[in-house]
Structures are given as C-alpha cells and as structure tokens.
Amino acid sequence: MKIALIAHDRKKQDMIQLTTAYKDILKKHELFATGTTGLKITEATGLPVVRFQSGPLGGDQQIGALIAKNDIDLVIFLRDPLTAQPHEPDVSALIRLSDVYAIPLATNMGTAEILIRSVEEGAFEFRNIVHGRDRDA
C-alpha cells in the first residue's frame, strides 16, 4: 500500500512515536510524506520515505494530487486542532479529496493506530480493486 504521512509541527513527535512503534508494519509499504515530517521519520526510524514540499509550501497539495489520481491508499494526517494553520484551505482540500476518493484517513493517534493495524490484517482489499490488482495473482 501507498501510505501518506503528514503531521503539523506540534504533532511531529507523535508521528515519530507512531512510525517507530509500527516500523515493522510500515517497512512493507511505500511511504510518502511532507518535507519535514518525512525527514524526521527517516532520521528516527531509517524507513525510506518519498518526501514532498513542507505542508505550507505545497506538500499537502502534492499529496492531494496523488489522492486525486488514486495513487495513495491511506492517509495519516496528525493535525493540531488547537493551532491555526496558514495553509488551512490546503488541509481542508486534502481531507475532502480523501472523502471523495474513499481513502482511509486518520487525523489523530487513536485512529492512526487502528488503520495501521488494519493494514497488517489486510482490511483494505477494496484498494486492490481500485488499482485493478488481483490479490490471488
């Protein structure tokens, strides 16, 4: 699966903890992230991450473009709900696109853990259908 990882500044440490805790699951998948988040994940875990611009510089939009092409299967976006974000319209657009294309989306640690564990259990087989992959092939 192709998994997007995004975290606002005050949630980056949470993302590090999440990716460290679930490194063995995440290493089996393609990871994508906004700039600083991706760098911090790689530094902390050694996981390879395709990095885009930082969120305020267009990284959220770059990931949104992949969602619009159905090239992302799951999004973990640890948002800071208590701090105004200068790129809030980009954040809203990314969440909207996830809904439009039925991309599983977590915006907090509890849901992120459930989604990652579900990935390991094969709970997102519908994404294989979206991509035209036959799991028995």
Swiss-Prot record:
Q: What is its EC number?
A: 4.2.3.3
Could you cite one Gene Ontology molecular function of this protein?
Answer: methylglyoxal synthase activity
**Keyword Mitochondrion, does the record have it?**
no
Instruction: Identify which top EC class this enzyme belongs to.
Output: lyase
UniProt catalytic activity: dihydroxyacetone phosphate = methylglyoxal + phosphate
Write down a Pfam family by its short name: MGS
Say which domain of life the source belongs to: Bacteria
Answer yes or no on keyword Lyase. Answer: yes
The entry's function note states: Catalyzes the formation of methylglyoxal from dihydroxyacetone phosphate.
Which NCBIfam families does its entry note? MGSA, PRK05234.1
Question: What protein family is recorded?
Answer: Belongs to the methylglyoxal synthase family.
- Any idea what this protein is called? Methylglyoxal synthase
Organism, per UniProt?
Bacillus licheniformis (strain ATCC 14580 / DSM 13 / JCM 2505 / CCUG 7422 / NBRC 12200 / NCIMB 9375 / NCTC 10341 / NRRL NRS-1264 / Gibson 46)
